[in-house]
Amino acid sequence: MSDLSHIRNFSIIAHIDHGKSTLADRFIQMCGGLAEREMEAQVLDSMDLERERGITIKAHSVTLYYKAKDGVTYQLNFIDTPGHVDFTYEVSRSLAACEGALLVVDAGQGVEAQSVANCYTAIEQGLEVMPVLNKIDLPQAEPDRVKDEIEKIIGIDATDAVTCSAKTGLGVDEVLERLVATIPAPIGNIEDPLQALIIDSWFDNYLGVVSLVRVRHGRVKKGDKILVKSTGKVHLVDSVGVFNPKHTATADLKAGEVGFIIASIKDIHGAPVGDTLTLSSTPDVPVLPGFKRIQPQVYAGLFPVSSDDFEDFREALQKLTLNDSSLQYTPESSDALGFGFRCGFLGMLHMEIIQERLEREYDLDLITTAPTVIFELVLKTGETIYVDNPSKLPDVSSIEDMREPIVRANILVPQEHLGNVITLCIEKRGVQVDMLFLGNQVQVTYDLPMNEVVLDFFDRLKSTSRGYASLDYHFDRYQSANLVKLDVLINGDKVDALALIVHRDNSHFKGRQLTEKMKELIPRQMFDVAIQAAIGGQIVARTTVKALRKNVLAKCYGGDVSRKKKLLEKQKAGKKRMKQVGNVEIPQEAFLAVLRLE
């Protein structure tokens, strides 16, 4: 389709479970993208993991042809985006390739914090945002209240927002008509030299790197020589095409279109996301503005259970980083766990997903250590360093000041659950910044230590508000705090993988909890196992896993007390000897115990 005015590029913004993948299914069905027998729920969520958890993790793209009521056939390039707070990076990438976005809001639930955050990202990038109310068939749907909320909270006019039900298909054609009318056509020139933005790329064992691109100017076809701007390497194009939703090869990709390019790039860093592609004959085409690199918020050590898997693990991480560029990793070694990698994630869900993808897609067995955030330390020498691993913390005597990262959290919550949410924030050492009453909802803004947020704040928030509160947060600053390193000693030996950095006020409590938890998880040995929590040289908590022992007095019956004493002393000496040479195996659950501290 050569006419730019007949192309519409858009993505869907919505909170988790507001029905964007279902709406995508309806679009595909109405535009005849798949035969009836191939239709299945959530066609675009291709990863098994996405289907099981019912969430979208990766952004997916589809090209559909829609014949509008005015008789014109439009090409719709549609990019499905994730809704979870950990995957905002995927969303900002998808938005960079579009001219417009559909803001899908559940007509029963109303506006949630995550859609607000993504909507602002879209408006900042200059996109046309079109509100759509979904799930209008539900008995609890209140379209008027929700339209009012969209105007109050986000500030876009929603008086004549389209209403539909993606599940039943009601009003979906109306959404498509409105979309074609409101979302602007792309601007670009087919005659100009090629300029294309890489939105996403992944590694295929047969084809090499497959890149999803948005062509801004010019055209690209099979047999062209393309130049990757950041690496300066030239590759020959094997094929170009679009997803509708299957791989479909086309003659070429032109300005304004979204599609894939395969150029048998074998190096996994050969086509980085956010990079610009052009033809090798026009190397001086300006670079397109990419997306801002996102800094990981949470760090954890990942170690293969068997050290023979280390090389496979490294390769798996490299392939995964291509597909998920927000993942960062550096090699690390631990006395307790051997060789592995210190990985940076965007949040806890992201960490779980990555671990599951590594275990499933690459068949690895992994152990994860407790996640931590980055701390800023000012040393007595005046030097500032950043520490993402408690076991790498320098000696306390050399530290002038320890600072922890603070996040600015926006929480949207119905008024009846406000009290519980405030109690939770205070318990997590939060400081209230602002509170706004918007209709039935309240928007509270808190400054919270990131250390408290990353572990279980999201789950606790959902449970105290019966699932109604929603959260969006971003890093704000570093702030001085009274922090200490809590070490765990097992039989007097420090286990580096179990160390934590905690606030001094909580340290005794955390130490007690941790030792109690470890006592349940470490199996009983033939000798007593002492589990201690220490801050520096001071032991703050201790529990003992009692030894298994044989009853050596069973054969004595009424015998003499000195005989009994002799047998008991002999047993004691044996246990003492065992303790000196014995090693304690720590099970994987024990490393994760740190996560489950309330």
Curated annotation (Swiss-Prot):
Main enzyme class: hydrolase
One Gene Ontology term, aspect cellular component: plasma membrane
Enzymatic reactions: GTP + H2O = GDP + phosphate + H(+)
Keyword terms of this UniProt record: Cell inner membrane, Cell membrane, GTP-binding, Hydrolase, Membrane, Nucleotide-binding, Protein biosynthesis
Subcellular location: Cell inner membrane
Gene3D superfamilies noted in UniProt: 3.30.70.240, Elongation factor 4, C-terminal domain, Elongation Factor G (Translational Gtpase), domain 3, P-loop containing nucleotide triphosphate hydrolases, Translation factors
Any Pfam family: GTP_EFTU
GO terms under biological process: positive regulation of translation
Main subcellular location of this protein, as a coarse class: membrane
E.C. no: 3.6.5.n1
Limits of the tr-type G domain: 5-187
Keyword GTP-binding: yes
Positions contributing to GTP binding: 17-22, 134-137
Membrane topology qualifier: Peripheral membrane protein
Coiled-coil segments on the chain, per record: none
PROSITE patterns on file: G_TR_2 (PS51722)
Endpoints of the signal sequence: none
GO terms assigned for molecular function: GTP binding; GTPase activity; guanosine tetraphosphate binding; ribosome binding; translation elongation factor activity
Function (record text): Required for accurate and efficient protein synthesis under certain stress conditions. May act as a fidelity factor of the translation reaction, by catalyzing a one-codon backward translocation of tRNAs on improperly translocated ribosomes. Back-translocation proceeds from a post-translocation (POST) complex to a pre-translocation (PRE) complex, thus giving elongation factor G a second chance to translocate the tRNAs correctly. Binds to ribosomes in a GTP-dependent manner.
Protein family according to the UniProt entry: Belongs to the TRAFAC class translation factor GTPase superfamily. Classic translation factor GTPase family. LepA subfamily.
PANTHER family according to UniProt: TRANSLATION FACTOR GUF1 HOMOLOG, CHLOROPLASTIC (PTHR43512:SF4), TRANSLATION FACTOR GUF1-RELATED (PTHR43512)
NCBIfam families the record matches: lepA, small_GTP
Protein's name in the database: Elongation factor 4
Organism: Pseudomonas fluorescens (strain Pf0-1)
Classification of source organism: Bacteria, Pseudomonadati, Pseudomonadota, Gammaproteobacteria, Pseudomonadales
